[in-house]
Regions:
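Short beta-strand->loop micro-motif that forms the acidic, two-metal-ion catalytic signature
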Residues: 45-48
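Catalytic core of pol beta-like nucleotidyltransferases
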Residues: 1-26, 35-40, 51-107
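Glycine-rich beta-strand-to-loop/alpha-helix junction loops that act as flexible
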Residues: 30-32
Length: 107
């Protein structure tokens, strides 16, 4: 059964990132929540697509994603993905799975 609260949680998280200065093109929920197989213990797998992440990612970028996640909902597992990477990458298994099964969200 799909938890209908998850997209709202993810959108609020993306909006929090925007308020912190991150240009977010989209979020993509994938994994058990996208497949409708989540349990109450499932995390929220969320790709954050931003041109900011096309450049080499810094520890500060990763810390920002995780700190915002903890403040919104500790189940969020943010994964940074560059805009170009989202469109063109053919080597990342996670990106490929998210493209195939993911549910896209606008921030």
């Amino acid at each position: 059964m799909v938890d209908t609260t998850i997209p709202g949680i993810a959108r609020r998280y993306l909006q929090r990132l925007v308020s912190l200065g991150v240009v977010v093109e989209r979020g993509v929920i994938f994994g058990s929540h996208a497949r409708g197989e989540a349990s109450k213990w499932s995390d929220i797998d969320l790709i954050v697509v931003s041109p900011r992440f096309d450049a080499p990612r810094t520890r500060d970028d990763i810390n920002l994603l995780w700190k915002a996640a903890v403040r919104e909902d500790s189940r969020i597992e943010p994964i940074p993905c560059g805009s170009k990477e989202w469109l063109e990458d053919k080597t990342s298994a996670i990106v490929e799975i998210a493209r195939r099964e993911g549910k896209e969200l606008a921030p």
